[in-house]
């Protein structure tokens, strides 16, 4: 029996009680047949099978490994039929329940089969109950060697005898093969090993000992790879036997873990080698001489002394006296569900199954029951309800059968105060001493105080529910609405997938009755109708109306944990009183109600609050407060604040649950959040996808306690761990793992093509997926030889958090079996790995033969340099880098999970232009890899998707996806299907919005206005300086007053240069870039002035002096002009591009809103179409079906079908919206980058032009240069245009005219004019 305070889990060798071997008389019964059958029930000597024989000698056999639970007494099944109860009642003593043994078995957590047996006495029933469940949860049996599983197969053959007590040969053939060719192989092997091989032959049990079966196994598998290994060890020995010295060397160099301490784990010595030879060598002569033959060597490799995992890892190996926040805790999400989030079923049984599997945190979603009995139901869906009391009783009965460590009940409470009080009373009555209703004296609820350790909370149930804080009502009730503790005000994280929630809400409303009543599934599947009135507390609305789909547990980030735990936070979330007859707003309807005093009194160490910030949590340091995040919010925190997230989880609990879009109850990869130290990573246990397989594999260790101690760097406050670390962390010894897949044995009884994949999960730097895969061995599931090169995981940064998953697949992608093995505890050397099913049960004889090498990581010379060259990710921004790192755990999670199933189910025919092109997965057309929700509902319907593609004017391709449709055998199919096809046509698709190009942005009115304003200012400045220069040129500089000026312009340049002939680009600037405006600046430098002065040779002394004086004044005016011109240019350069950026931002924001408006519009049209289809169908049904019950049933089907189809359409439109949003965002980014590049180039051009322009005089001319080669330019007394240079005549001739320069720019052209009249 289970000892007090103990569990049925054990790592000890199996000992089957003699009473179970001898057998006992029972009456087997089931309610379906209504009959009771006397049987004799037994267990074989090795504890593999439970079997019973009836009076006709008919045998039934049950694999004990598939047994999930065994019950007697209060929780055993009881016959419903009175007559059957009388038949099965034996003996006058004890009640029927106390004499009943109910055996529960199944291949997953949902589909359970119950077998019931009644005996004569209570003690007999108790003995069998305890004995069977202890065998079922024996870790020694679960992790047995390859030899043990051979013994199990042999035992089954020996039990399945015919009426004459002999073993039919056909049973042996059937065990190994189904295919005709493989059956011939088995028949030949039987013949060669001296056994009967005919199909109708049989074998005496006494002549079919285990040795005979083992010889048959050897012949079928050949094991040539083991023979090669053996030869490499013994060399050219004539006897082909391994000596003691050779065995010692093999044990120490190949089979020993080099990471182990030599004192605690000493090397093998000759004495140890002799023990192994004595144990495994079948030839006594060899054993006496200390020699090991090939047969003995194979037996050792398959034996108990050569496990793949260190036996200590299976036992309770972790320190259980650390604070609870230092452990990963096996957690379940939406525990009550057994399938789909919208249309699945609820179950009391699955609570038992999750707890028995080691789950230590389950979720209960309470709602008001119609009969004043609180119920558990998935709010606002078609999922039927179950009574809360039944669930609490199931938890009390199963919580500590397989683990004695504390269980957390995560309440999501929507009940009114009266029913909340009833729940609290049930908890006290049903749980009794197991309920932790007050904190421990050693760990008070105070800041800076750690949580108690699991060891102190053995066999305790902890309630997680909102905590009532009375002082909030007195201090904050006068605050403005914006200050009230709503998610928008208090929480920086928003509830994910509001679009999907709104979608589901509208679908639900569309399925409601015309008169305002709302349909709701009840426990027995009927649909109840109600007005749905009442406040948020639910005082009138007893059960949740079908208004909207609850997206997920809103523990903190949504609305459920709106109570804060201190005065510095805000009010509990309450709903204002509503006018009579009005329903609360949908977004309020799903919120949790305020915690009642009775249930609040039960809450202590797990108090959910809104998450505000890591800084706030660190400042308060209340370890008893915890927050919950959906997977998207947690991923955001992980990417943006990884180190802070890890530090937060050192002291406080955090719960991460699947996003609300996972209607099919799929899971995210839990490794993603284990990397951040999140303790309660909650998964949908009903879905055995890749994520759940990994979860089950990891929590199998530490005695399946449900608690795994986190690595030291995730616990110590004085240590820092970055989950995105790529290099070795100081203080952590990195590891290297190498795995060679050599062969497989009996992977499948089909003649299949098989391959093996080896993946590693851990930190992003350690995670390797879909990289290592063996070749495909064709037509051989019996003994495939892979003999691959080693799969090397060169550097494992954090081995304590890393695990290996080895999986065998059929060529089509169907999972054969897998195994999850933590790197810490992995045994090196040549090892057999027995494969498991998705739920973690052993698969008959299926095993892989591996060569494993584990060692500490030693970097190669210059490895860091080589890594930097080969890994450009290091030079990206941190967020981009983390996105890429996380992709190995997020992008492919759902795709890989579906690969474990038959891939043919995930593929559909794709038609392009009316022709069948190829077979392609649905997701590849439905969504982008980055946002790929796993929606099986969408795949369960007939969906036509039209994809518009602009392709050089070649028109559009219509892509039709044909998936399995929901099977409804009434006219709804036709009407709604027609409606769906209309809804899904292109006219109801989300509009395609294209980003405005840069040219349109720069051509916008506000940008043009700025450009025109600049041109006017520059023109005004030019005119001002023209006047100044004319004034200077007209002043008398010579003592010869009264004479005509001697300066006369000899050439007049009035040619205006258009933008095409002369723009502001320098000779070295890039073509095609125009800046808004740039004047012809007249640069000046001392060198240029000196060169000009040296080069001038003006005729006459007085006139020469006058010319120089006048030129210096002109040059001074030119400098002032150039300076002011440049200032204006700088000012408007910024103004023009700021205006362009504003236009761009406004345009892009408007386009995003336009896309969202398009989604809302088309969604409304979709809902309208569905509602119209439903109304029409209901009218049609009323005319066709006269039977009232049939009519009600058909209406239910209509409502259910519309909801499912509506959700699928919502999902499709949302996916299209997300895809087009992503595309639009990329276009926006491209335009923003183009504008920035345009701005930068314009700046470069301005700077180059400023440097290259100059104003010098040469041979009587003032030359305005635009290029850097002006020193070689000469004038000849005439106007010239050479390249970008303007030459103006300034010669002081007899005409005596004054000179002036007039550079100007108007409307993107440069005009230079100089004119003076005498």
UniProtKB/Swiss-Prot annotation:
GO MF annotations in UniProt: calcium ion binding; phosphatidylinositol-4,5-bisphosphate phospholipase C activity
Domain of life the protein comes from: Eukaryota
Residues given in the record as substrate binding sites: 464, 466, 628, 655
Domain PI-PLC X-box, residue spans: 318-466
Skewed-composition ranges (Polar residues): 571-580
Tissue specificity annotation: Expressed in neuronal cell bodies of the optic lobe, central brain, and thoracic ganglia in adults, and the brain of larvae.
Organism: Drosophila melanogaster
Record GO cellular component, one term: cytoplasm
Region (Disordered): 466-489, 505-594, 1080-1112, 1296-1318
Record function comment: The production of the second messenger molecules diacylglycerol (DAG) and inositol 1,4,5-trisphosphate (IP3) is mediated by activated phosphatidylinositol-specific phospholipase C enzymes.
Domain PI-PLC Y-box positions: 599-715
First-level EC class: hydrolase
Designated name of the protein: 1-phosphatidylinositol 4,5-bisphosphate phosphodiesterase classes I and II
Biased composition (Basic and acidic residues): 585-594
Catalyses which reaction(s): a 1,2-diacyl-sn-glycero-3-phospho-(1D-myo-inositol-4,5-bisphosphate) + H2O = 1D-myo-inositol 1,4,5-trisphosphate + a 1,2-diacyl-sn-glycerol + H(+)
Basic residues: compositionally biased ranges: 466-481
InterPro entries in the cross-refs: C2_dom, C2_domain_sf, EF-hand-dom_pair, PI-PLC_fam, PLC-beta, PLC-beta_C_sf, PLC-beta_PH, PLC-like_Pdiesterase_TIM-brl
Keywords linked to the UniProt accession: Hydrolase, Lipid degradation, Lipid metabolism, Transducer
């Amino acid at each position: 029996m289970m000892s007090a305070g103990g569990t049925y889990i054990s790592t000890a060798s199996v000992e089957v009680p003699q009473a179970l071997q001898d057998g006992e008389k029972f009456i087997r019964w089931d309610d379906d047949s209504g009959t009771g059958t006397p049987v004799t029930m037994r267990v074989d000597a090795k504890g593999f099978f439970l079997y019973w024989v009836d009076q006709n000698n008919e045998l039934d056999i049950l694999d004990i490994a598939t047994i999930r639970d065994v019950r007697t007494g209060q929780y055993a099944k009881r016959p419903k039929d009175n007559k059957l109860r009388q038949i099965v009642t034996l003996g006058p003593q004890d009640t029927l329940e106390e004499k009943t043994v109910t055996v529960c078995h199944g291949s997953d957590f949902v589909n359970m089969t119950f077998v019931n047996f009644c005996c004569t006495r209570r003690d007999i029933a108790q003995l069998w109950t305890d004995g069977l469940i202890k065998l079922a949860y024996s870790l020694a049996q679960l992790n047995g060697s390859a030899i043990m599983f051979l013994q199990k197969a042999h035992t089954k053959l020996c039990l399945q005898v015919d009426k004459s007590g002999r073993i039919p040969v056909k049973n042996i053939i059937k065990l190994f093969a189904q295919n005709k060719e493989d059956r011939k192989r088995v028949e030949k092997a039987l013949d060669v090993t001296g056994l009967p091989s005919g199909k109708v032959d049989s074998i005496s049990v006494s002549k079919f000992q285990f040795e005979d079966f083992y010889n048959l196994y050897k012949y079928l598998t050949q094991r040539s790879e083991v023979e090669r290994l053996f030869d490499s060890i013994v060399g050219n020995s004539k006897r082909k036997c391994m000596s003691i010295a050779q065995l010692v060397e093999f044990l120490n160099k190949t089979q020993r873990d080099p990471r182990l301490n030599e004192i605690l784990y000493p090397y093998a010595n000759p004495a140890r080698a002799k023990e192994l030879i004595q144990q495994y060598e079948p030839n006594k002569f060899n054993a006496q001489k200390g020699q090991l033959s090939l047969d003995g060597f194979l037996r050792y490799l398959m034996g108990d002394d050569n496990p793949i995992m260190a036996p200590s890892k299976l036992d309770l190996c972790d320190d259980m006296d650390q604070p609870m926040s230092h452990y990963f805790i096996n957690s379940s999400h939406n525990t009550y569900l057994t399938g789909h989030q919208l249309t699945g079923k609820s179950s009391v049984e699955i609570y038992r199954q999750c707890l028995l599997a080691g789950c230590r945190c389950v979720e209960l979603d309470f709602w008001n029951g119609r009969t004043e009995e609180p119920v558990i139901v998935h709010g606002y869906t078609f999922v039927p309800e179950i009574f809360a009391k039944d669930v609490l009783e199931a938890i009390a009965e199963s919580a500590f059968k397989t683990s004695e460590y504390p269980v957390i009940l995560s309440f999501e409470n929507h009940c009114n105060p009266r029913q909340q009080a009833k729940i609290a009373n049930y908890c006290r009555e049903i749980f009794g001493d197991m309920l932790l209703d007050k904190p421990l004296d050693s760990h008070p609820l105070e800041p800076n105080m750690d949580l108690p350790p699991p060891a102190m909370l053995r066999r305790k149930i902890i309630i997680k529910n909102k905590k009532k804080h009375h002082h909030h009502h007195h201090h904050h009730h006068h605050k403005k609405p914006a200050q009230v503790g709503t998610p928008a005000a208090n929480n920086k994280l928003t509830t994910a997938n509001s679009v999907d929630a709104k979608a589901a809400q509208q679908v639900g409303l569309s399925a409601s009755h015309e008169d305002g009543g709302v349909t709701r599934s009840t426990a027995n599947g009927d649909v109840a109708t109600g007005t749905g009135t009442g406040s948020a507390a639910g005082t009138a609305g007893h059960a949740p109306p079908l208004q909207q789909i609850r997206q997920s547990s809103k523990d903190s980030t949504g609305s459920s944990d709106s109570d804060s735990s201190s005065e510095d936070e805000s009010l509990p979330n309450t709903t204002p009183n509503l006018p009579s007859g009005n329903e609360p707003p949908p977004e309020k309807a799903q919120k949790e109600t305020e915690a009642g005093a009775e249930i609040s009194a039960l809450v202590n160490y797990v108090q959910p609050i809104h998450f505000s910030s890591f800084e706030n949590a660190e400042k308060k340091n209340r370890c008893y407060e915890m927050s919950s995040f959906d997977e998207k919010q947690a991923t955001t925190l992980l990417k943006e604040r990884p180190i802070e997230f890890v530090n937060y989880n050192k002291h406080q609990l955090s719960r991460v649950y699947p996003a609300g879009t996972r209607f099919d109850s799929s899971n995210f990869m839990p490794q993603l959040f284990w990397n951040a130290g999140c303790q309660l990573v909650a998964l949908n246990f009903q879905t055995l996808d890749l994520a759940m397989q990994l979860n089950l594999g990891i929590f199998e260790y530490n005695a399946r306690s449900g608690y795994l101690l986190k690595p030291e760097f995730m616990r110590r406050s004085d240590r820092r761990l970055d989950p995105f670390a790529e290099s070795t962390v100081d203080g952590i010894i990195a590891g290297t793992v190498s795995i060679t897949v050599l062969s497989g044995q009996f992977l499948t009884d089909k003649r299949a093509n098989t391959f093996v994949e080896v993946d590693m999960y851990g930190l992003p730097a350690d995670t390797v997926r879909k990289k290592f895969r063996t070749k495909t061995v064709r037509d051989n599931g019996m003994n495939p030889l892979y003999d691959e090169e080693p799969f090397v995981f060169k550097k494992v940064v954090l081995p304590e958090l890393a695990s290996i998953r080895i999986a065998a697949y059929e060529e089509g992608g169907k999972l054969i079996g897998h195994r999850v093995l933590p790197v810490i505890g992995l045994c090196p050397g040549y090892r057999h790995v027995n494969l498991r099913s998705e739920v973690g049960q052993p698969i008959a004889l299926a095993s892989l033969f591996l060569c494993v090498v584990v060692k500490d990581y030693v970097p190669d010379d210059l490895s860091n340099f080589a890594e930097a060259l080969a890994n450009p990710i290091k030079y990206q921004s941190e967020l981009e880098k983390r996105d890429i790192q996380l992709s190995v755990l997020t992008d492919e999670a759902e795709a890989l999970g579906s690969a474990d199933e038959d891939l043919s189910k995930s593929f559909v025919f794709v038609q392009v232009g009316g022709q069948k092109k190829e077979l392609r997965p649905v997701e590849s057309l439905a969504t982008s890899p980055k946002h790929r929700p796993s929606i099986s509902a969408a795949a369960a319907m007939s969906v036509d998707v039209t994809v518009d593609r602009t392709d050089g004017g070649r028109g559009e391709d219509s892509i039709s996806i044909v998936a399995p449709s929901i099977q409804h055998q009434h006219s709804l199919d036709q009407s709604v299907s027609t409606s769906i096809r209309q809804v899904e046509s292109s006219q109801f698709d989300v509009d395609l919005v294209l980003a405005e190009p840069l040219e349109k942005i720069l051509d916008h009115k506000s940008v043009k206005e700025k450009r025109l304003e600049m041109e006017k200012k520059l023109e005004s400045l030019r005119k001002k300086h023209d006047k100044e220069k004319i004034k200077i040129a007209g002043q008398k500089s010579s003592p010869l007053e009264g004479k005509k000026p001697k300066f006369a312009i000899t050439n007049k340049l009035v040619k205006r240069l258009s933008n095409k002939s002369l723009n502001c680009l320098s000779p070295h600037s890039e073509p095609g870039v125009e800046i808004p405006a740039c004047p012809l600046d007249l640069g000046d430098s001392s060198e240029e002035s000196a060169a000009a002065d040296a080069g001038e040779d003006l005729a006459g002394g007085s006139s020469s002096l006058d010319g120089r004086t006048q030129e210096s004044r002109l040059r001074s005016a030119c400098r002032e002009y150039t300076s002011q011109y440049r200032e204006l240019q700088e000012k408007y350069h910024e103004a023009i591009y700021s205006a362009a950026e504003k236009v761009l931002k406004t345009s892009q924001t408007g386009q995003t809103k336009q896309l969202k408006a398009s989604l809302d519009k088309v969604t409304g049209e979709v809902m309208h179409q569905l509602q119209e289809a439903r109304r029409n169908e209901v009218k049609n049904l009323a005319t066709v079906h006269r039977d009232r019950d049939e009519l009600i049933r058909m209406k239910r089907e209509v409502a259910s079908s519309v909801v499912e189809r509506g959700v699928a359409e919502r999902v499709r439109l949302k996916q299209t919206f997300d895809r087009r949003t992503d595309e639009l965002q990329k276009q926006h980014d491209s335009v923003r980058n183009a504008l920035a590049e345009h701005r930068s180039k314009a700046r470069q051009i301005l700077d180059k032009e400023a440097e290259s322009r100059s104003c010098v005089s040469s041979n009587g001319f003032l030359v305005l240069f635009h290029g850097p080669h002006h020193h070689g330019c000469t004038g000849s007394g005439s106007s010239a245009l050479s390249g970008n240079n303007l030459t103006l005549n300034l010669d002081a001739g007899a005409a005596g005219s004054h000179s002036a320069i007039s550079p100007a720019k108007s409307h993107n052209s440069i005009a230079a004019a100089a004119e003076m009249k005498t």
